[in-house]
Amino acid sequence: RYVMGDRCYDDANDHDIERMASVTREALKAGALGFSTSRFYGHLDKAGNLVPGTHAAAKEMLAIGGAFKGLGHGTIEIISDYLEDDDELNWIEQIMRDTGRTITTLTAPGKREKIWQLAEKMSQSGLSLRPQCGARPASILMSLEGTINPLAIFPSYKAIRQLPLDERIAHLADPAFREKIKTEQPIHHRNPDAKRFTTSYDEMYPLDDALSYEPGIKDSIAGLAEARGLEPLDVLMDTLAEQRQIIFFFGGYKGNLSPYFDNIARAHSVFGLSDGGAHCGVLCDASVPTYMLSYVARDRTVADTLPLEFIVHKMTQNTASVFGLNDRGVIAPGYLADFNIIDYAKLQLEPPKMVYDLPGDGKRLIQKANGYIATIKRGEVTFENGIATGALPGKLLRGGT
């Protein structure tokens, strides 16, 4: 859109492509860490259109990739629904061979095996293709306070939605109100995903007390209802009235996270995004690093844990190197003194919590953790026992420095 304006949904002409490449190179010279593109059908603008660039031609992508030539830094990030298409993989490979730059792509278990094959092929040529792996499936947290509430499709609940939380909980304890909910026609969202995460009770899981994020199939709202001889809607209302979060997994969750951890253990993988702010009332994955250290490396009993040292390396030096941040991730002379001091036996997440501290009393999910004795940045203590010290030694990151 920056280059093409209102024509951004049209095919780019030669002048547009040349300008995009020029802007990319200018940004890289100014210190940009790289270039990112979305070719994913889930990314829409506010009008419901696919974001510009979703269908950008290979010619356009190759020209932008060419902007990296000779600079010696910069990473290319690609989110694509086409990673099983040979044409897509061909231009990705060509950019890597032309520029020598690292490319990282989003992937998921059971899909896109071709990207892993290409990653191995590239490594044999001394090139780096790094598929990104999430520690957990893409998910949302639903609750009475959350942006997404599965009861909001019922007219009777809509009528009380603006009441204080304690009054809504009282309504959910009222047999007459519950019966009214169960007998009325829900108003479904036209978006298939939105309808799915308000009606698919076999894909809704109350967040367990251990915060494992790894429930068994029997632990779903539907599974609990069957075990208790109740209707799923009754279990849903009970769970929400108890102020428990309900997690909904996208991507076909199969009852454990082993496929995700198996991907993380692959040689060419890199940890993917753990979103802590973009979807304030919907999820809080800023807890993922603590989750990996505590649950995946220590507390997991469903299947094997991953070695603690491996997880620390994957989250620090291994990830930093993908973006050319080669001054961190190791405790050694010449590196930034960035590290946490942890009481590992006490390292534990707290449940997600909704707070109202954004402008206009806006809400956001937070998730605190215990066990961090100190966080040190550039040799200065920035947090001590979870409390900010006021020290702000961080600096603006620039690529190529």
Model-derived features: positions:
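Active-site neighborhoods of metal-dependent hydrolases
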Residues: R1-D14, M20-G66, I78-R300, D304-T305
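Divalent metal-coordination and catalytic microenvironments
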Residues: G31, Q132, G229, D275, ...
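Short, well-structured alpha-helical segments that form the helix of a local strand-helix-strand
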Residues: L233-L240, P307-T316, I331
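Acidic, glycine-enriched loop/beta-strand segments at the rims
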Residues: I247-Y260, P307-F310, A320-M354
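C-terminal cap of metal-dependent C-N hydrolases
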Residues: D262-S269, S274-D275, A286-V288, I341-I387, ...
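Gly/His-enriched, cation/cofactor- and phosphate-binding structural elements
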Residues: A297-S321
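Ligand-binding pocket scaffold of soluble enzyme catalytic domains
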Residues: G329, A374, L396
